[in-house]
């Protein structure tokens, strides 16, 4: 078994960190030695608002209060009741919270955390963000490709992946898609180990797992800690078979420390304070009972036999108990010993504060874009039946619509029906684009985690998703539908007009998809952008339909057309189809008689009734409007993504 000072382990970390940009010699030494994380008098405050929307009041709440401790290589557990303190402490140590509310010092081997500490340490969130539509190896290759510098050879990356697969006993499952909770958890850990960072944070890694799977995960973490890694994780009431593997234990409640030290000394610490521990009791349950005020002790002898019947009294009792336990720990010899070590580590570092909020990437934009597109296409292939069903429905619907309009003839009485077909094409592009709002919503948590961990920049993710998701799922179905309908219906058969129509359909589809994207990028639920976009398109399509029969918008509502995406697309399709058409052939006396009292005989007449300019600009102005609308909406989408990444860090 490798020791904590194993030169092989340190050399592997050095090879990786030498390739990191903006990493100086001091940072290299800090991160390649046995990583000892110390935190000194840290407090964390959050500002919350309450009240009515226009009369909200802001309150500052102290979530962590004057916490100090040290985490050495090994298994460092953070336990506590369900009040959010343990996960908050973990996130603060991992630099995954807004640093503006943080006070105190957090050091690595006695030096301030690097500004890009989030990118030079591993973090496994409580809710797994593994892509379940690709294999375990594909997930690891994605992590290695984006988090390791391009200067590292492909063979070296493959070697690291194979080592991690063997370490976590994933060799047999490497070509399986991670669907089970246990496999997803191990895959999440493996993705962090590929980078060989010396510190790994895990937020409740055993949540939702059975005892056997929990034991397997903890044993995996223990094997990693024996390699010299510092494993820091939060956990809730583990069994003794799990607890016995812990090297360090930190008990927190109400934002205060109840105990911090060797895990095996915790029972003796509370025994010496007067708490009676029964041999058959689980240590983790015993600690939480003490924190929750469930045990009488020498500090509470005057309250023996008292029954708390009300919730408020129970809450007040717990608050008093945690306060007493925190004071007891602050006056204990254990804290004095820890304080002496912390003071020695701190030295003069109080003058060198680091915000630890910078996110750096070790790969260039094009490299990130390529891998995001490849991963998106693999994800796309992971839903084959969805693709097949969508294709079948598109073909059937297009064939039905084309057949229904197959009766179109080049005469005057078919003008409105021809325009109705183009209106139906416009409706299809708009309605099918509504679901585009889910593109950035369903991957929101994964995006936050991967971006914060240094996988890619926001720009790479943005353009990669647009190219890999919208083209196969939005543009191709729209193009296929329009192509089949156009050919079967037998409208204006000209190569120039055909390709112009396809170009118009693509621009319209992308512009229509940009609207739900701009709304969905800032939302947590798919229902919100779907509802808003549906209302918008129904409203705008209604007015576009009125213009088909009345010739123009209602005078008092004419301004609406300037904000209507369907309006611009429909007008462009009309211009392309009707310009140069003659619906009253002079050599067909039967059709001439049918057109005797009919007003419209040429396509130009119909376009003029619709208020469409007959010049080339009358066509291209609609394209320009659609492109400008698309650019504005996609810009809003990008800004939304930039804002989202700053709201909550993962």
From Swiss-Prot:
It holds the Pfam family ABC2_membrane. Coiled coil: none annotated. Residues 409-420, 491-498, 549-623 are extracellular. It is found in: Membrane. One of its GO terms (molecular function) is ABC-type transporter activity. Residues 1-387, 442-469, 520-527, 645-648 are cytoplasmic. Keywords: Membrane, Transmembrane, Transmembrane helix, Transport. Residues 381-644 form the ABC transmembrane type-2 domain. SUPFAM superfamilies: P-loop containing nucleoside triphosphate hydrolases (SSF52540). One of its GO terms (cellular component) is membrane. Residues 37-279 form the ABC transporter domain. Highest levels of expression in thymus and spleen. Detected in lung and small intestine. The chain crosses the membrane at residues 388-408, 421-441, 470-490, 499-519, 528-548, 624-644. It is a multi-pass membrane protein. It comes from the Eukaryota. InterPro entries: ABC2_TM (IPR013525), ABC_transporter-like_ATP-bd (IPR003439), ABCG_dom (IPR043926), ABCG_transporters (IPR050352), P-loop_NTPase (IPR027417). May dimerize with another subunit to form a functional transporter. Belongs to the ABC transporter superfamily. ABCG family. Eye pigment precursor importer (TC 3.A.1.204) subfamily. This is ATP-binding cassette sub-family G member 3.
């Amino acid at each position: 078994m490798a020791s904590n000072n194993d030169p092989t382990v340190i050399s592997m970390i050095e090879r990786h960190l030498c390739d990191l940009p903006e990493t100086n010699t001091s940072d290299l030494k800090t991160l390649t030695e046995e990583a000892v994380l110390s935190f000194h008098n840290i407090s964390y405050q959050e500002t919350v608002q309450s009240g009515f929307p226009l009369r909200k009041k802001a309150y500052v709440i102290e979530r962590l209060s004057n916490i100090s401790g040290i985490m050495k290589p090994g298994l460092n557990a953070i336990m506590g009741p369900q009040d959010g303190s343990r996960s908050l402490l973990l996130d603060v140590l991992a630099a995954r919270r807004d640093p503006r509310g943080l006070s105190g010092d957090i050091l690595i081997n006695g030096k301030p955390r690097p500004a890009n500490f989030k990118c030079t340490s591993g973090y496994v969130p409580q809710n797994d963000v593994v892509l379940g539509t690709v294999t375990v190896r594909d997930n690891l290759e994605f992590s290695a490709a984006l988090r390791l510098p391009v200067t590292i050879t492909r063979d070296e990356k493959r070697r690291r992946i194979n080592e991690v697969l063997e370490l976590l006993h994933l060799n047999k499952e490497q070509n399986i898609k991670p669907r089970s909770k246990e496999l997803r958890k191990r895959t999440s850990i493996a993705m962090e180990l590929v980078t060989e960072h010396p510190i790994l944070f895990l937020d409740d890694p055993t949540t939702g797992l059975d005892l056997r799977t929990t034991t397997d995960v903890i044993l995996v973490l223990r094997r990693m800690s024996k390699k010299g890694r510092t494993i820091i994780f939060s956990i809730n009431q583990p069994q003794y078979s799990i607890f016995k593997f812990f090297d360090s234990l930190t008990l927190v409640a109400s934002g205060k420390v109840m105990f911090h030290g060797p895990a095996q000394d915790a029972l003796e610490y509370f025994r010496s304070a007067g708490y009676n521990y029964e041999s058959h009791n689980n240590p983790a349950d015993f600690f939480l009972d003490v924190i929750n005020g469930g045990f009488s002790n020498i500090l509470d002898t005057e309250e023996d036999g008292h029954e708390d019947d009300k919730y408020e009294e129970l809450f007040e009792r717990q608050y008093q108990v945690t306060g007493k336990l925190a004071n007891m720990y602050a006056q204990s010899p254990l804290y004095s010993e820890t304080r002496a070590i912390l003071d020695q580590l701190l030295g003069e570092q109080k003058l060198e504060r680091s915000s630890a909020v910078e996110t750096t990437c070790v790969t260039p934009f094009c490299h990130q874009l390529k891998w995001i597109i490849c991963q998106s296409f693999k994800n796309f292939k992971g839903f084959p039946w969805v693709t097949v069903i969508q294709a079948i429905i598109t073909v059937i619907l297009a064939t039905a619509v084309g057949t229904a309009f197959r009766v179109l003839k080049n005469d005057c009485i078919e003008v409105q029906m021809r325009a109705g077909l183009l209106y139906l094409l416009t409706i299809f592009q708009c309605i099918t684009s509504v679901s585009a709002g889910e593109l950035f919503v369903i991957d929101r948590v994964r995006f936050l985690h991967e971006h914060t961990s240094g996988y890619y920049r926001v720009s790479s993710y943005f353009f990669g998703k647009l190219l890999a998701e919208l083209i196969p799922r939005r543009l191709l179905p729209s193009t296929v539908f329009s192509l089949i309908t156009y050919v079967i219906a037998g409208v204006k058969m000209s190569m120039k007009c055909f390709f112009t129509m396809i170009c118009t359909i693509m621009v319209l589809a992308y512009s229509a998809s940009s609207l739900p994207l701009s709304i969905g990028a800032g939302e947590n639920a798919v229902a919100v952008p779907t509802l808003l976009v549906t209302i918008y398109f129904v409203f705008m399509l209604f007015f576009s339909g009125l213009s088909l029969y009345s010739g123009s918008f209602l005078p008092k509502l004419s301004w609406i057309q300037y904000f209507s995406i369907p309006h611009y697309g429909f007008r462009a399709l009309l211009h392309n189809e009707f310009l140069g058409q003659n619906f009253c052939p002079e050599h067909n006396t039967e059709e001439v008689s049918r057109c005797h009292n009919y007003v419209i005989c040429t396509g130009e007449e119909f376009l003029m009734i619709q208020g469409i300019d007959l010049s080339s600009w009358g066509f291209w102005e609609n394209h320009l409007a659609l492109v400008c609308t698309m650019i504005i909406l996609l810009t809003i989408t990008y800004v939304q993504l930039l804002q989202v990444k700053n709201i909550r860090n993962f």
